[in-house]
């Protein structure tokens, strides 16, 4: 199952992350995880939020251009080698990881990785065949808030 990620382009200068975070807070939308990648002139803020549709609406009304990308959330054992074992599944199928980021919890031994694959359906099929838990939007939200 694919989940929805919001991407915003921000100028690469101090203070640019504050306003989109304020917009989301004012709408009662929680940021579940994020990553910020920079280039010389701009940054790409990627967000997984509690309500992606409402977040998109609120951010667009505030003047932001919001791109929605389908990504794959995968639950992996938070132990040495957990990620390496999973990544091996993609090598022989030539499935490319365009980018990824992750978060962990202090209360259990699981990590959640967010992936952007060049072949998401093939990646999901491979993960499920290996018995790896591919999460849905609601599961990502639930695992972070419980």
Can you say where each PLM-predicted feature lies in the sequence?
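A conserved regulatory-domain signal marking ACT and ACT-like small-molecule sensing domains
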Residues: 1-146
């Amino acid at each position: 199952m694919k989940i929805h990620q919001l991407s915003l382009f921000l100028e690469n200068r101090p203070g640019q992350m504050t306003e989109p975070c304020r917009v989301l807070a004012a709408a009662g939308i929680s940021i579940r995880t994020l990553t910020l990648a920079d280039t010389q002139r701009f940054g790409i803020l990627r967000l997984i939020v509690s309500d992606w549709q409402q977040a998109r609406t609120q951010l667009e009304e505030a003047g932001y251009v919001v791109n929605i990308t389908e990504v794959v959330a995968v639950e992996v054992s938070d132990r040495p080698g957990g990620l390496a074992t999973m990544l091996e599944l993609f090598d022989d199928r030539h499935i490319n990881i365009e980018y990824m980021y992750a978060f962990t919890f202090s209360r259990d031994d699981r990590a959640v990785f967010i992936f952007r694959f060049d072949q998401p359906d093939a990646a999901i099929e491979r993960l499920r065949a290996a018995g790896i838990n591919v999460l849905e939007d609601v599961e990502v939200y639930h695992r972070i808030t419980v």
